[in-house]
Amino acid sequence: MTSLSRPRVEFISTILQTVLNLGLLCLGLILVVFLGKETVHLADVLFAPEQTSKYELVEGLVVYFLYFEFIALIVKYFQSGFHFPLRYFVYIGITAIVRLIIVDHKSPLDVLIYSAAILLLVITLWLCNSKRLKRE
């Protein structure tokens, strides 16, 4: 079996990087559309007189922040030279678990487990922002 030459490997790498960039660009545009739809939905819920609309509003706000964080992650990917910073994934994980607690808070044990997961993610975030692991 022959090994690939260096120029061929670089060409394949460039093609794959371009496909990845185009895919992330499309995903970013789709997320912007969803962010716009969520904005309209939040405006509708804000002016709804029902009591349940308050819970919908809080849940919608957290979903809004999730869209926002994913878009920020894609922007940061392009700004940092095609690299995903780990801390952005941790932010998204914390926000997603907070949303889960807001939506599904019937079982106290589940809420405790979710809270422990958030604590673990916050510790991870602290470690990622420490001087030894800080890259930016």
UniProtKB/Swiss-Prot annotation:
Intervals, Periplasmic compartment: 36-54, 103-107
Record carries keyword Ribonucleoprotein: no
Topology feature Cytoplasmic, residues: 1-14, 76-81, 129-136
Membrane topology according to the record: Multi-pass membrane protein
InterPro entries in alphabetical order: P_starv_induced_PsiE (IPR009315), P_starv_induced_PsiE-like (IPR020948)
Keywords: Cell inner membrane, Cell membrane, Membrane, Transmembrane, Transmembrane helix
A Gene Ontology BP annotation from the UniProt entry: cellular response to phosphate starvation
UniProt-listed NCBIfam families: PRK02833.1-2 (NF002764), PRK02833.1-3 (NF002765), PRK02833.1-5 (NF002767)
HAMAP family tied to this protein: PsiE
UniProt similarity note: Belongs to the PsiE family.
Descriptive protein name: Protein PsiE
Organism expressing this protein natively: Escherichia coli (strain K12)
Designated gene of the protein: psiE
